[in-house]
């Protein structure tokens, strides 16, 4: 029953991180140095500035992860420089795929309300509500995520 007070933060999710995750997977398939991303990698944070791509949560390499993040961040700009505006790939990877995974209750990439910051993480909806992936993270990766959190708080 509608209470007139709007939606709770837990009822809203952004799906822009899906296309960034898909781009990271594409680069991982092209370059063997990034191959661990396909099984152990993660995408965190916003769709743009502050994005963090981790080559692996088990065998994190900060320099490699920063290189992969840069490739992912600039991929869209390179496509636009060619005269194209990418619509289909983001619609599929951020929209359709992530939405289907959400509706199935499967793990997917999405920005969710964590406290007072919207942060892109791997998550899923269960009968008990939103579940975000909880991992032990290497210190260097945790530090990057803390930097992104600070950046996002400054936007508010």
Positions of PLM-derived features:
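Long, compositionally biased stretches enriched for glycine and/or charged residues
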Residues: 26-156
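Glycine-/Pro-rich loop/turn segments that contact NAD(P) or position catalytic residues
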Residues: 1-35
